[in-house]
Amino acid sequence: MGMSFSHLLIVLLIIFVLFGAGKLPQVMSDLAKGLKAFKEGMKDDGNDNDKTNN
């Protein structure tokens, strides 16, 4: 029971209404930066564990 295309469209429409057309690019940019920082943090955390185990 995954999200269908119509569900995704509704979610995107709600986001568009909440943030407006002007702010949406900034919100998406901030979200992408946050995800990138999270992934780098997870990668760095794994590297720290390898160093402490040796």
Swiss-Prot record:
Its main location: membrane. It is found in: Cell inner membrane. It is a single-pass membrane protein. Keywords: Cell inner membrane, Cell membrane, Membrane, Protein transport, Translocation, Transmembrane, Transmembrane helix, Transport. It comes from the Bacteria. GO terms for cellular component: TAT protein transport complex. GO terms for biological process: protein transport by the Tat complex. The keyword Cell inner membrane applies. The chain crosses the membrane at residues 1-21. NCBIfam families: PRK01470.1, tatAE. The Tat system comprises two distinct complexes: a TatABC complex, containing multiple copies of TatA, TatB and TatC subunits, and a separate TatA complex, containing only TatA subunits. Substrates initially bind to the TatABC complex, which probably triggers association of the separate TatA complex to form the active translocon. Belongs to the TatA/E family. This is Sec-independent protein translocase protein TatA. It comes from Rickettsia prowazekii (strain Madrid E). The gene is tatA.
